[in-house]
Amino acid sequence: MSSVILDLQIACEHSQGLPKETLFQHWLDGVLPQFQSESEVTIRIVDEAESHDLNLTYRGKNKPTNVLSFPFEAPPEIDLPLLGDLIICRQVVEKEAEEQQKTIEEHWAHMVVHGCLHLLGYDHIEDDEAEEMESLETEIMQKLGYADPYLAEKE
């Protein structure tokens, strides 16, 4: 049994064509156990309207985005394995996959890996942080059997 608990919420109008829950679990299992022995993550799949609202409210950006990460910070006296929530916008992920000439599955996997690293405290604001995070993403994606998600940018 996995040491990562997944709470998958499908909050988009059309759910056909989305990755199966087992794939989301596989992606979480590919990234989190190397950092934490136990984790619980909520992944909420949303449409552009909800992504736009959340991105505006929490990041001040007036557009939908691919993935938002909301780390859970419990008070010190509470010991919970809850890592946080990932909000992933279906339409943005599908559009980006096409633009970046990636398979949809590959880009979904990348968004889960990318979001989990944010939940773990990684960031890409500064160049050195971005380099470290992208390197980890590439390593994890390749371990999961996918290509380097930043390959096109490196060519």
Curated annotation (Swiss-Prot):
Q: Coiled-coil region(s) at which residues?
A: none
In the record's cofactor note, how is the cofactor described as bound?
A: Binds 1 zinc ion.
One GO cellular component from the entry? cytoplasm
Chief subcellular site? cytoplasm
Cofactor dependency: Zn(2+)
The top EC class is hydrolase
Provide the protein's localization.
Answer: Cytoplasm
SUPFAM superfamilies the record matches: Metalloproteases ('zincins'), catalytic domain
What keyword terms does UniProt attach to this protein? Cytoplasm, Endonuclease, Hydrolase, Metal-binding, Nuclease, Ribosome biogenesis, rRNA processing, Zinc
Q: Which GO terms describe its biological process?
A: rRNA processing
UniProt-annotated binding residues for Zn(2+): H114, H118, H124
GO molecular-function annotation terms? metalloendopeptidase activity; RNA endonuclease activity; zinc ion binding
Function description:
Single strand-specific metallo-endoribonuclease involved in late-stage 70S ribosome quality control and in maturation of the 3' terminus of the 16S rRNA.
Its family remark reads: Belongs to the endoribonuclease YbeY family.
Q: What is the name of the protein in this document?
A: Endoribonuclease YbeY
Species of the source: Photorhabdus laumondii subsp. laumondii (strain DSM 15139 / CIP 105565 / TT01)
Q: Gene for this protein?
A: ybeY
